[in-house]
Amino acid sequence: MNEPATHRKIAIEANNSTWEILAKPIAEITTDEAEEMTRRAYAAAYHWQRAEGFGPANDARAEWLLSRVWAVRGNGEVALGHARRCLSICESTGLVDFDLAYAHEAMARAHACLGDSAAARQHLESAGNVSIADPQDKAQVDSDIAAAPWFGVEQ
């Protein structure tokens, strides 16, 4: 199981299967599904770190996914920890564009979950100010920003 190609395959599967649950309306996610979603997101992060071709973008995206999962679960403290790591990876490795926008989206959502509307709005503005070259990537970021939960913070 130490084959980097195998880790990559499992990371992709775990990441995509996390979205099978995350894509559901929050009110429809059961307690068991929330636990399963969390396990899948951590599994994805674990396998990405050992995957063939692993780089800072994989690391940042794994942290983003963990932040999103914890925000959906209503745990802002844990969500914020992963969001901070996501943003730190972007800033320390020069990731911009899509990844930097998502890092700010994660920060915004985690702050919103914690009830800090001012910080949430600041990071939403930062996410919106990131230049994203690919129109499809921009549409994906915008779609995710439009998705719940925002805990009463307007996007």
Regions found by a protein language model. Give the residues of each.
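Residue register of alpha-helical TPR repeats
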Residues: 12, 59-61, 102, 140
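Short coil/turn linkers that connect adjacent helices within long alpha-helical scaffolds
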Residues: 4, 50-54, 91-96, 132-136
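"A position-specific structural signal for the A-helix of alpha-solenoid helical repeats
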Residues: 16, 65, 99, 106, ...
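TPR repeat positional signature
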Residues: 7, 14-17, 21, 40, ...
